[in-house]
Amino acid sequence: MSVLNGKKILLGVSGGIAAYKTASLVRLFIKAGAHVQVIMTPASKVFVTPLTLATLSKNPVYSTFYDTPEDVSAEESQLNGEGVWNNHVELALWADLMLIAPATANTLSKMASGTCDNLLLATYLSAKCPVYFAPAMDLDMYKHPSTLANFKALHEFGNTIIPAESGELASGLSGEGRMAEPENILAFIESDIANKLPLKGKKIIVTAGPTYEAIDPVRGITNKSSGKMGFVFP
């Protein structure tokens, strides 16, 4: 059984070509037994549709602070009390872990500096759960000093960076910067969580069967335990 079974995962999708991989990522999380909620930046919807991710996650996809009827402007909707407020604090508190994938250079920079101009950024600032980043950008952007400084800042905040992989990039160049494959992201997160489990690396002795405590040389106290409970443990 996956360590993600029953976990609530908040997936943040930013606007990069690697966003198309998030469909596979959502499917993998669902197969692992996780509950998935998706937040998309406005730019990410150019690369993958909210309908796709909503269908796969079986949950509505959030993108803006305020959902309004299609035929009404946001200003009119708010004045008339129509529409639905997407509470970023509730979304953040719901999650057991948060993953930003793909994490573009722009989104990384904003999160490292505390910028809060869309629903995903506001939710990140409200998150109390472990946060993972799967960067996706061109080689020179990935190696740029400002990007490296943002990685360092996010790491110091307690976040985890999933290293980008090498290969052909959208620019036609080849090198580091492409987002890790969905299977590798899943494996990375599962391994990271497993390594942080409270009993990881502990040596445990399991006893089974009845116990006997002497009262004196003649009498003693015992029980009729079968030991079955102890034998259940691997």
Give the predicted meaning of each segment:
Residues 1-131, 138-227, 231-234:
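A cross-family phosphate/adenosyl-ligand binding-site feature
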